[in-house]
Structure formats: C-alpha cells, structure tokens
Design a protein with these regions (language model features):
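Alpha-helical transmembrane segments
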Residues: 37-43, 179-182, 379-381, 521, ...
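Membrane-entry segments of alpha-helical transmembrane domains in multi-pass membrane proteins
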Residues: 19-34, 49-57, 154-172, 210-223, ...
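Hydrophobic transmembrane alpha-helices and their helix-loop junctions in integral membrane proteins
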Residues: 179-223, 229-550, 561-567
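Transmembrane helix-loop-helix hairpins at membrane boundaries of multipass inner-membrane proteins
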Residues: 2-27, 45-199, 274-290, 348-350, ...
Length: 770
C-alpha cells in the first residue's frame, strides 16, 4: 500500500455512527411474511379460486416488492443524510493530525491501527465530507429481535437485520419472483398441479426473503434449509417422470453434503463467539477475539456449504440436472434464490472469511481458488451442451465462480454487484429459453431450434440483450460488474492499476479466460437457436410463433434492467463534471460501513485492463462467430457443426471433447465408483451382519426360549404344579370314600351317637376357649 492510499485509509475512519431508523426498515419482516401467508392461502383455498391460487401468489409478492422498494428508498435516505447529522468538531482536524505524522509513524501506526475499521467506502464518505464540512459517519444496520427462549444463561433470539446488503437482496428477490409468477401463469397454464406449483413458488420466495433478513445464524440455517426443501419440491414438480424425481433427489442429497459443513461451521462460530448473532460473530472475528485457526476451520466448513449450494466445483453436478423442473423455477433458482444463497452467506459473514483466510495482503486462498477453477471449468462444459437450459446452467455455475473468486480476493462490493446485475440478465436468458421451448416444445438447440429470430422477434431481441450483458461487453450491466471483479484481484500491475487486497494474479488470468469462454459458448447458443434454418418439428401446429404478453413483458423488463443496472456503480473517473451522484453509488449504499464489516481496500479502475479484457472477450465472440456463422453456415444453413471438424481430425481434441461430454467424469465418480462401489460391499456386509449376526442371535434366543418353555412345562408345570393339584384331589377323594365307608352305614343310633359326641366336643371347646 503506497503512502497516498495509506493516508486516505487512515483519514477515512468514521468517528461517529448513526442508527438507521424508519417504519419500513423496522417492519421489513412483513416482506417474507406476505408470500408465506400466500402459501397457506393457496394450499387451503387455491383450487376454489378463479385463477387457481395464482392471484394470491402474485398479489403477495407484488406487495412485498412495494415494501422492498420503500425499504431501499428509506435506507438510501439514511445513508445520504448520515453525514448531515454531525458537524465537524474542528476543521480538517484529522487531516492535520496525519500531516504532522512522520512517514515512518504513518507506515507503522496508521496501517496497523486504522485498517481494522476503515473501508474503501469510508474513503469516499470522507472525501465528500471534507468538501462539505462534515465528518464521515457510519450507518448501523436496523436490528429488531425478541427473545424466543432462554436457558443456561443463553438467549435464543429471533429477529431481522436490515442494511444495504439486505435491502438490495430484498429488491432483487421480489422483482425476479414477481416476474416469474406472472410468466408462470402462461408457461404452466393447464398444468396438472398448477395450484401446487404456485404454492411452492410463494414458499420458495418467502424462504429466501427470510434467509436474507436473518439476524442470527440459527435463522440462517433455517432459511438455508427451507430454500433447499422448496427447490427439491419444484425441481421434481413433474415427479411422475423418473429423470425429474432423480434430479430433485440428486439436488437434495448433494446439498446435504455441504450442509454438514454449514452446521459444523456455525456451531464452531457459536461456541467461539458465544453468540448466535451475525453482528457479534463478525465483530469477534474482526477484533481477533476468535483464534485464527478456529476461524480458518470455520471458514473451510462454511466453504463446503458454498460448494454445494452455489454449485462450485466438485459439488456442482446437481445444478445442470435441476433443469428438469419448470423453466420459471430454473430462472428463480439461478437468478435470485437457491444458488445465490451461498454467495449471500459469505457476504453476510465476511468478517469470518476475510480474517479466516487472511485475504488482505495474500495471493492465494481456498475461496479464490475454487471460484477461479469453477468459472473456467464450467465455461468449458457449457460448450458441449445441446440443451439450451443446461448451457445456461453451466453459465450460472461459471458466473457464480466469478462471485466466489471476487469474495476470495477481497472484492466484496464487486461480488455483490455482480450478483445484482447477473440476476437480471440470467433471469432474462432462462425465461427467454423458456419462451423458445414453449413454442417448439423442446430444449434441444440442434434438433428443435434454428432460425427462431424470424418467428419470435421479441424473444430474440431480449435474449440478445441479456446475452451481451452476460458476455460482459460494454456498455451493458455485465461489463461493469465483471471488470470490477478483475480490478479487485489486485494482480494487474501490468495494466497500471493500484490497490486491492493482495496480488491474486491467478484469479485475474482465470477471470479473463472465463470472459472469453462466456462469449464463445453464448455465440454458439445464439447461432444454434436463432440463426440458420429451423430444424424442429411443428407437431402439426404450423410454424413456431411468438409467446404471449405474460411471457414477453417480463422479458422486456429484464432486458431493460440488463442494460441499466450496470450504471448504478460507475467507476470513479468514468465521467467528468459533477457526476458524484452516479459514481460508485451501488457500493456507497450497499457496502457496510460499520464495526461488523472488515477493512477492505478497493483497487483503482484501470481502463487499460477494461480494454484488454474487452478485446479478449471480443476475440471469443469472433472465433465462435467465424466457426458457426461462416464455416458451419456455409456447409449448410441447417448444419449445427462441421462434418469434418477438429474433433474428427485430432485425437487430443476428441479426447478433450469426450471428457467434457462426460462432465469430467464426476457423475461417474460419484455414482458408479463411490455410490455403487460403496453400496455393494456395504450391502453385502449388512446382509451378512443381518443373517449371521442379528438373525443368528435372534434365532438362538428363540431356541433357548423354546427349550426353557419345554423344561418348565414338562418338569415344573406337569410334575410339580399339576402333581400337587392332582395329589390333593386324590387325597380328598380317598378321604371322602373312607369317611363314607366308615360313617354312612344306614344305622340311626350310630348317627345319633356321632352327633352327641360332636356336640360334646364343640361345647367343651367353647367352654375352654371362650
């Protein structure tokens, strides 16, 4: 860090903080509550309604969107007015203090003492405040909670945490969810479980919104699992077909692997920090109240959860198979719910990851490595997919790799900004693919598509816009967020840049390669889907036709957002004049300026890097366009690849193509080797244990019990018990017979003598004893 940057960082420390307030922020719990309520209304009354419950879901999520927008406005107002609440106590006091400090003291003291609480956003606030006469002020998150129960001195609380990150996600989730709801009314019209679909769509949205607002890690776990359960239900919506139910089960089980890491990591954080609160845990991590080794172990465990939920390499295999669900569900999963939950969790607990992986001043960590490898590996897999939804699925895996990589290099704002922009253009692409499939009744680009631009002009135009945004080409949204990630790697001194949290050269190189791959495989998608000749079957319905308004209007809205979203965080220096209201606005409102957020450094923008990455991306477009639009089209407008291409000529290329087609053999590894390889021996061992062990013991116990019963019956019951009873009976019988023989002889005088004797004896006994 040079002296100028160090001075700016030191001067940026906010000396005061204000508590954000406002009715909408404090009652943000209504936002997830509304779709949760609609879930129950649809279940109980949906089938009786005119639109089979869809009206409940759409109304609820629309109201949630209105509340989310109000929260966004209220939060922006709080941040903008924060510095106006406090006048500077003395003019330029902080600046004079540091101007009098020697360069050596500045290097030794300012770096170690102020970096713990400063951030790049704080620099911006100070810079603005320096001119206006106000000092930088931190805006604390709105936290509303109540004690659920208390035991052993530990309080279990439930509440909400609302800050810039939360309100941004509330807006994204509600916007995408509302458009998906509207789109679905046409797409799944006439479905055999139409009401069931909308019920779980509402619950899915509510679960993600609950997760976003979680104030503590217990709520985070609950929201995390609810999102997983809803995705399982919706991926397997058409469960009668075995591939669909298998895909749902695969998604569920794969995520269980990562969830074990989530539980272990959260337990470690609770016992280390002594609190469930996300704020308390982050503060403890940042202030070194938790040991480095403990933070590292917790970070590794939580990273395992990110691998499964966000579809990162080696646990990404479930995500392409999840395309078995309805296309609107795929859009919601990939743009605003399931997979971005992993990114959000890292962003929310960033103090833990930043300190645990020692991101500042480093050049390597697990997050950066996983993200870098995933974005390139998934990009290569997208090349060989014929199913348009699977191409987009691997594209999502790749783009999530960008976000994970950005978080790994300390580019927090860049990662979250890319999550924001990606939500709009990826939702647009999935819904666009659904529009095409709705017309041709297939997702196979090679067999069922081609030339679709002539039949579906609106879908084509919106798909092109969202594709350019995904490619990261200027001036659309993806360009600004992707290049901010590349800047954040800090490994680009070659391009004249400064700053960053370390020198992550490998991440930078992989990020640039990933940009070229994205452009190349999306060019292939554009050609196979919209150019050439139509290769599909009309199924007796005539030529394909454009979708209805309930499908195309959401596409238009998303394409507009794919254009404009990037301008919310323009880099400083991009425009001249009074443009501070447009420069880095996203980071200004979203990046926390509080004690629960670590001190991260932002790299300065480099137009050299931006131009270079754009040239590389355009090279990817050019190579793919030359192959498909010129070579393949020249062979035949109906062709989808060259008959005598590289894979037919070159053994190495063919082998590489086979590896990609087999998805790096990961499914083979998991299913055939690990699962089946374990299942056979384990099943045999379990059978032997059951037959020889458990059954043997049970059978032996049974035999011993039978022998014991026989002994008791023969020796005790028959001889002893029955013998005693029989003997007493025979004795009574003998006595009676003897008495009868002796006494009862028919002589009256003998009876009288006996009666007299008996009376005499009784009288004597009476006299003696009474």
């Amino acid at each position: 860090m040079n002296m100028t940057n160090l001075f700016t960082l030191a001067a940026a420390v906010p000396s005061k903080s204000v508590q954000a307030t406002g009715w909408f922020l404090e009652t943000a719990w209504l936002i997830p509550a509304l779709p949760a309520l609609s879930f129950f209304l649809i279940l109980f009354f949906g089938k009786k309604m005119k639109y089979k419950g869809a009206e409940f879901g759409i109304t609820a999520i629309a109201l949630s969107l209105i509340l989310a927008i109000c929260c966004v406005g209220q939060w922006m107002n709080q941040v903008d007015n924060a510095s106006d609440n406090y006048k500077k106590s003395s003019s330029y006091e902080t600046e004079e203090k540091y101007s009098e400090t020697s360069s050596q003291d500045l290097e030794e003291n300012a770096l170690t003492e102020t970096i713990e609480v400063a951030s790049a956003e704080q620099m911006n606030i100070y810079a603005a405040g320096d001119e206006s006469g106000y000092e930088p002020v931190a805006v604390d998150a709105v936290i509303e909670r109540f004690t659920w129960w208390e035991t052993g001195g530990k309080k279990f609380q439930v509440g909400i945490m609302v800050d810039g990150l939360a309100v941004m996600m509330l807006f994204v989730v509600t916007v995408i969810s509302l458009l998906v709801h509207i789109y679905s009314t046409d797409y799944v019209s006439g479905d055999r479980r139409y009401t069931h679909y909308f019920a779980f769509l509402s619950l899915f949205s509510a679960s993600m919104l609950f997760f976003v607002l979680s104030e503590n890690i217990l709520q985070t776990i609950v929201g995390w699992e609810l999102v997983g359960v809803c995705s399982f239900a919706l991926i397997g919506h058409w469960w009668e077909e075995k591939p669909n139910s298998d895909a749902a089960l695969k998604a569920f089980l794969t995520n269980r692997v990562g969830d074990m890491g989530l539980l272990v990591g959260m337990i470690i954080l609770f016992w280390s920090a002594g609190s469930w609160s996300i704020v308390d845990i982050n503060v403890a991590a940042i202030n070194n109240e938790i040991g480095q080794t403990t933070l590292l172990i917790a970070s590794l465990c939580l990273t395992a959860a990110v691998l499964s939920k966000a579809g990162q390499c080696i646990l990404h295999t479930w995500l392409p198979d999840a395309m078995a669900g309805p296309t609107p569900v795929s859009a919601l999963i990939h743009a605003a719910t399931m997979v971005v939950a992993g990114i959000y969790m890292v962003a929310r607990l960033y103090g833990v990851f930043f300190e645990g992986y020692d991101i500042a001043g480093s050049s390597f960590n697990v997050l950066a490595l996983v993200g870098s490898v995933t974005l390139v590996g998934a990009g290569l897999l997208a090349f060989v997919q014929d199913d348009i939804k699977k191409v987009l699925a691997y594209s999502t895996v790749s783009q999530l790799g960008y976000m994970v990589m950005a978080l790994g290099v300390g580019a927090w704002t860049a990662a979250v900004f890319h999550l924001f922009t990606h939500a709009f253009f990826k939702a647009g692409l999935f819904l666009g693919a659904g529009s095409v499939s709705h017309s041709v009744h297939s997702f196979d680009m090679k067999k069922s598509m081609g030339g679709m631009r002539k039949f579906m002009p609106t879908t084509y135009k919106t798909f092109i816009i969202c594709t350019i945004a995904l490619m990261g080409l200027p001036p659309l949204a993806g360009f600004w967020s992707k290049d901010e990630i590349l800047v954040g790697t800090g490994g680009w001194g070659l391009f004249g840049g400064t700053g960053g949290n370390g020198s992550y050269v490998f991440a930078l190189v992989m990020g640039i390669i990933g940009a070229a791959l994205t452009c190349a495989y999306m060019t292939r998608v554009i050609y196979l889907t919209f150019f050439g000749e139509f290769r599909g079957d009309t199924h007796g319905h005539g030529d394909p036709h454009e979708s209805g308004k309930r499908i195309t209007v959401p596409l238009i809205i998303l394409s507009v957002m794919a254009i404009g979203a990037g301008f919310l965080n323009l880099p400083v220096g991009f425009l001249t004049g009074n443009t501070t209201n447009w420069q880095e606005r996203f980071g200004h409102y979203v990046e926390p300026v509080a004690t629960y957020f670590p001190a991260i450094a932002h790299g300065t923008p480099s137009w050299t890097l931006a131009i270079f990455s754009t040239i590389v991306a355009l090279t990817g477009v050019g190579l793919a366009a030359h192959y498909f639009f010129i070579k393949v089209n020249a062979q035949s407008p109906a062709a989808t690849e060259l008959a005598n291409g590289l894979t037919a000529k070159n053994k190495l290329a063919k082998a590489g193509h086979t590896v990609l087609k087999q998805k790096y053999y990961l499914d083979h590894l998991y299913t055939d080797i690990i699962a089946n390889g374990t299942k056979g021996p384990v099943a045999d061992a379990a059978y032997w244990t059951n037959q020889k062990g458990i059954d043997g013991i049970v059978n032996q116990v049974g035999k011993q019990a039978a022998n014991s019963a026989t002994f008791v019956y023969e020796k005790i019951d028959q001889n002893l018990v029955d013998g005693a009873v029989n003997l007493s009976g025979k004795a009574s019988e003998g006595l009676g017979e003897t008495t009868r023989t002796i006494v009862q002889r028919g002589k009256v005088h003998q009876y009288a003598a006996i009666m007299f004797a008996a009376t005499t004896i009784l009288a004597g006994l009476f006299i003696v004893f009474v």
